[in-house]
């Protein structure tokens, strides 16, 4: 009997340039530290770079989309009220810095090594003073079960909110299932919530997603972003239920096509 060939390891670092382009775009929003971080990276060229980005088709609508997505995860974190937060695939979002600046939260902010190193440097420059909480920026492959559980085990006692936005659309079914298993094991041991702003549906009628902010058509196709979305709301809920979760809260994104929601999930007992 022939064995099924193993899949070649994916190079997830190819996703990282999207985080840089999103930071530039978010510098035109109210998102905490986005403008200051962009200025550290692009210096005086930020206004010109942002102005150029905003000339793209549907730019302002997409800016609202990403700002709303960010704020929806903030709301879910507030409602969850967990003393510990693990954010996975956080990119160049500085939610952890803002939350630990203002609250006694213990926050572990993670992404792939290059992005985590860049963010750690930016955090030091953005807020060199003491924080109300504790912020740790570190590298983590969220699909690595052992590394995931070790990261959670290093958190102080108490329930954990595991948060993500902009991650699931880069993962295929097998990878999403592995991530869900890692989160489920962590929350079974510690209690808490999985908070995801990534419940995206495929574009209606098979229409192509909008290209912009450094995401070329080749980038979108190479990462199979459209294929990685859920086919409908029932399919999305079925995925999480099959992984051992129940949906305890939903925040709908105000959009005429209604293609994204943010969900809070608990381990099904």
Please report, for each region that a protein language model flagged, where it lies by residue.
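Short alpha-helix
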Residues: 226-244
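Short amphipathic alpha-helix with an adjacent loop that forms part of the alpha/beta core around
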Residues: 146-156
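Short, glycine-/aromatic-enriched active-site segment of Class I SAM-dependent methyltransferases
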Residues: 208-226
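A short SAM/SAH-binding and catalytic strip from SAM-dependent methyltransferases
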Residues: 159-175
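Core SAM-dependent methyltransferase catalytic element
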Residues: 253-269
């Amino acid at each position: 009997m022939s064995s099924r060939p193993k899949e070649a390891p994916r190079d997830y670092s190819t996703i990282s340039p999207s985080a840089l382009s999103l930071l530039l775009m978010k510098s035109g929003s109210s998102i905490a530290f986005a403008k200051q971080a962009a200025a550290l990276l692009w210096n005086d060229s930020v206004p010109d770079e942002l102005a150029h980005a905003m000339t793209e088709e549907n730019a302002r609508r997409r800016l609202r989309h990403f700002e709303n997505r960010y704020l929806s995860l903030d709301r879910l974190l507030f409602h969850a009220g967990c003393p510990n937060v693990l954010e996975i695939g956080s990119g160049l979002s500085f939610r952890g810095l803002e939350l630990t600046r203002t609250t006694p939260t213990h926050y572990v902010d993670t992404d792939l090594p290059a992005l985590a190193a860049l963010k750690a440097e930016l955090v030091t420059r953005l807020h060199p003073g003491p924080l109300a909480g504790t912020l740790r920026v570190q590298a983590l492959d969220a699909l690595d079960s052992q590394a995931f559980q070790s990261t959670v085990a290093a958190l102080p006692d108490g329930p954990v909110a595991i948060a993500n936005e902009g991650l699931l659309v880069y993962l295929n079914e097998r990878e999403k299932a592995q991530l869900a298993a890692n989160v489920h094991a962590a929350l079974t041991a510690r209690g808490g919530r999985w908070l995801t702003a990534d419940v995206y549906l495929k574009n209606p009628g098979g229409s192509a997603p909008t290209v912009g902010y450094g995401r070329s058509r080749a980038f979108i196709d190479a990462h199979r972003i459209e294929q990685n979305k859920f086919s409908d709301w029932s399919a999305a809920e079925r995925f999480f239920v099959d992984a051992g979760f129940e949906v305890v809260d939903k925040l709908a994104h105000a959009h005429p096509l209604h293609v994204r929601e943010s969900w809070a999930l608990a381990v099904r007992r």
